[in-house]
Regions:
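A helix-coil-helix interface module used to build multimeric assemblies
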Residues: 1-125, 129-130, 134-149
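Conserved small/polar residues in nucleotide/adenosyl-binding loops
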Residues: 150-159
């Protein structure tokens, strides 16, 4: 795996050793120890989605609050409501904006729930989800590491 070799060589340089001195830091034995693409890739995707979705949350809130403000501002403006591409019954423009705001409030709740579910990762499951070839306690320990740089409190999934 080329990425493991790059990481191993960067670690070697950082430690003051020559690139390729794999007796000190080996691409497979050290960098890739107890990992598999079947647990690392999905976990990395979950961590990335958790981080990026955190940027969406305040934007959704700001948009909802703007729509709520417009709902109040336009509470007295009458308009024709529409359904099935046809004119329907009268409503206020404020009611329409309030409906949009209500939908965004539901989206905010769903996003918060999805973000919570993204904290469950399958690191430590290794190739087939059993954790075979990983030392005891590895999954629990590796799930604690993202906290140091993302503030994410990841936890191991009960079923890999």
């Amino acid at each position: 795996m080329n990425a493991n070799e790059v990481i191993a060589n960067l670690a070697l340089e950082h430690l003051g050793h020559d690139k390729g001195d794999y007796a000190v830091v080996h691409p497979n034995d050290h960098v890739n120890a107890s990992q598999s693409t079947n647990d690392v890739y999905p976990s990395a995707l979950r961590l990335a989605l958790w981080e990026k979705s955190g940027q969406l949350q305040p934007q959704l809130t700001a948009l909802r609050q703007s729509l709520e403000a417009k709902a109040e501002q336009f509470a007295g403006i009458l308009k024709i409501g529409r359904t099935q591409l046809q004119d329907a019954v009268p409503m206020t423009l404020g009611q329409e904006f309030a409906a949009f705001a209500s939908m965004l409030a539901a989206d905010e709740r769903r996003l918060a729930q999805a973000r919570e579910e993204l904290t469950e990762v399958n690191l430590g499951g290794t190739a087939i989800g059993t954790g075979i070839n990983a030392p005891a306690g590895y999954a629990e320990q590796v799930c604690r590491r993202p906290v140091s740089y993302t503030h994410l409190r990841a936890h191991e999934t009960p079923e890999h």
